[in-house]
């Protein structure tokens, strides 16, 4: 191993240690990594000069000089997420810890036209320029949409909710000078679960948005299936004679356990539904909610028997949907 390689390894070890600890001191690094004080000091100076770390206050004194509190610069690099929905899109920017530090929702009905994709990507570029970020600061952009993608994540193959079959990654990436990735919104939610819970080996993920969605995690990976349909729990049939689903079948879990199903059954919006439900004055609303919970629990129990893994529920910017859960 060359001296240059060793220096790079030591520098990386120091940075990764600070990243994991979130806040630490020079002495803690020396002790934990068993490096010499001069080696640690040299690497801290390099990392600070490169803008990768910063001093942020002091630790309490134990009798001598107060030690600097060292942290990474969490937005040294950022990633951006775009959530495409039927009547709007969301933009979220996250730092190196995955913390969202910027979110915005922009009303814009989806249409498979160049003008639509230009408006979405212009909003992303406007955010980046407003923060005066250089292009190399952006690690990449992930686009989540309601639709099953091709195995290479370049095209939406099935998208009845938004009528977006044929949407292509290139529709966005041609306007954006960053690496881009296209994914089903439910599987994007599962990626978030893996990020927040790296110890998670397997799980069934329920995405409680306006439409129900789901994903399967096995062996720390999102299970895609042979035709990318794995995890589409919203189309499990719970009643062959039940309500008609947008997929053309009857009695799908979607028709019982989505915000849309609650609105259709109650004849009111979600914003109206939950406050009235909490008043406990309407037997009809209580029954609708109990039916929702009963079908959701039924699906969770059966999927747990198949996968034998924890069941998780989440939502992605679920405005006016089930964030009240």
PLM-predicted stretches and their roles:
Residues 104-202, 323:
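Glycine-rich phosphate-binding loop and adjoining helix at the ATP-binding site
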Residues 2-9, 25, 58-76:
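Short, cationic-aromatic polyanion-contact patches
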Residues 314-322:
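Conserved small/polar residues in nucleotide/adenosyl-binding loops
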Residues 1-31:
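Extreme N-terminal segment that seeds HTH/winged-HTH DNA-binding domains in transcriptional regulators
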Residues 103, 177-283:
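Glycine/GP-enriched mid-protein hinge/lid loop-to-helix segment characteristic of carbohydrate kinases
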Residues 303-313:
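Proline-aspartate-enriched helix->loop->beta-strand connector
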Residues 66-101, 213-217:
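Gly/Thr-rich phosphate-binding beta-strand-loop-beta motif of the actin/hexokinase/Hsp70
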Residues 23-55:
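N-terminal helix-turn-helix
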């Amino acid at each position: 191993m060359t001296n240059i390689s060793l220096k790079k390894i030591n520098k990386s070890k120091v940075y990764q240690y600070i990243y994991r600890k979130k806040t630490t001191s020079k002495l803690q690094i020396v002790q934990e990594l068993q490096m010499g004080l001069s080696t640690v000091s040299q690497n801290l100076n390099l990392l600070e000069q490169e803008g990768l770390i910063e001093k942020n206050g002091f630790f309490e004194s134990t009798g001598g000089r107060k030690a600097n509190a060292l942290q990474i610069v969490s937005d040294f690099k950022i990633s951006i997420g775009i959530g495409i929905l039927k009547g709007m899109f969301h933009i979220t920017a996250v730092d190196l810890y995955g913390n969202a530090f910027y979110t915005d929702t922009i009303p814009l009905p989806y249409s498979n036209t160049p003008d639509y994709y230009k408006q979405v990507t212009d909003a992303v570029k406007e955010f980046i320029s407003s923060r005066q970020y250089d292009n190399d600061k952006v690690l990449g952009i992930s686009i989540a949409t309601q639709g099953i993608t091709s195995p290479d994540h370049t095209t939406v193959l099935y998208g009845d909710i938004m009528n977006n079959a044929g949407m292509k990654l290139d529709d966005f990436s041609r306007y954006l000078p960053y690496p881009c990735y296209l994914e089903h919104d439910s599987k994007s939610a599962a990626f978030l679960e893996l990020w927040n819970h790296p110890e998670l080996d397997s799980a069934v993920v329920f995405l409680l948005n306006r439409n129900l969605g789901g994903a399967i995690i096995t062996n720390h990976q999102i299970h895609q299936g042979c035709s990318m349909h794995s995890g589409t729990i919203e189309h499990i049939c719970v009643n062959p004679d039940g309500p008609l689903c947008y997929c053309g079948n009857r009695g799908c879990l979607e028709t019982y356990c989505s915000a849309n199903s609650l609105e259709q059954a109650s004849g009111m919006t979600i914003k109206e539904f939950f406050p009235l439900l909490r008043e406990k004055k309407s037997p009809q609303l209580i029954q609708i909610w109990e039916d929702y919970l009963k079908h959701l629990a039924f699906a969770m129990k059966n999927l747990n028997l198949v996968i034998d893994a924890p069941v998780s529920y989440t939502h992605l910017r679920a405005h006016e949907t089930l964030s009240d859960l």
